[in-house]
Amino acid sequence: MSKRLEAEVWSLDNCAGCGLCVAACSKQVLEWEPGTLHPVLQKRTKLLGLSRTPLDSCSFCTQLCVESCPRLERWAEMEPRLVTAARARGPVFSGAPNDVIRAILAAGRSSGLLDGVVMLDLDPWTLQPVARVVTTVEQIVETMGPQYLWAPVFDALNEAVFTHHMQNVAVVGTPCAAQAIRKLRQSTNPRLRPYQESIRLSIAIFCTGIYKPEMIEEVLVKRMNVSRDQVKRIKAHDLLEVAEGLGNFLAG
């Protein structure tokens, strides 16, 4: 872990929460812990005789976490090339906010332009957001997509790149995640080349705020007395109220 990352991002509560630093860490010493707002460094020790000595896991490191962190970059505003409105048709057609994205991904997968997609899904039993790799049109259609709840989408990136050996991966996430991919593509570090060569498409959803999964328990279960198995989809109607913990969620 770079001292710069700790000083300029984590200590200032400026972490995007995308998880790319965790995925890219060559020593795999960064991890997420429950309730934390940023990754933490694993504490490792080595036993020498009867003495246990703490190890500096980041010594002689290429600092891939710094190379991939979007919060260490000042981003200039990008001029849009095209502004348009669209509706989903075909296998994806329900009018939900993420359906246009899923229709694009389904078309890309069916045409062979994409090998798979790294995206967020919602566990139907726990209502917890999870990052997953989807590889078929059927999986893309069935995946809920982002539900305004935070989870590090890049948790599933290594599975796509190194387990499935995908060469044409799409990543769907928040604008922060898209900025992380831009930072990744700008890097000249050869250790990041497998990611650069595998990510073909990056899609950022419109984002006016994303919320902790604990809000499900606080708002739906405790305040509204709605059991988790009654919820099919989550929609945020008044983002200000949601941010204050008084969210108006619809249980369908």
Where are these regions (language model features)?
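DHp/HisKA histidine-phosphotransfer helix
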Residues: 46
